[in-house]
């Protein structure tokens, strides 16, 4: 499943794992994507939506 929000196009951010031993490796910060059934132009549709958009009310379920 793609970790991209269909509403705001939020996608994963990238950074570093930095443990105490300082061995730095790459990591991904994935957005909290939920698969919800929403109405788009009067028809129900399944969308990948981040929880920020759900809380903001940008999606009608």
Swiss-Prot record:
Q: Which GO terms describe its biological process?
A: translation
Any Pfam family: Ribosomal_L28
Keywords annotated in UniProt: Ribonucleoprotein, Ribosomal protein
> What domain of life?
Bacteria
- InterPro entries, per the entry: Bacterial_rp_bL28, Ribosomal_bL28, Ribosomal_bL28/bL31-like_sf, Ribosomal_bL28_bact-type, Ribosomal_bL28_sf
Q: What GO molecular function terms would the record report?
A: structural constituent of ribosome
GO cellular component term, pick one? ribosome
Task: Read off the HAMAP family from this record.
Answer: Ribosomal_bL28
Protein family membership: Belongs to the bacterial ribosomal protein bL28 family.
Could you tell me what this protein is called?
A: Large ribosomal subunit protein bL28
Task: Give the originating organism.
Answer: Nocardioides sp. (strain ATCC BAA-499 / JS614)
Encoding gene (name): rpmB
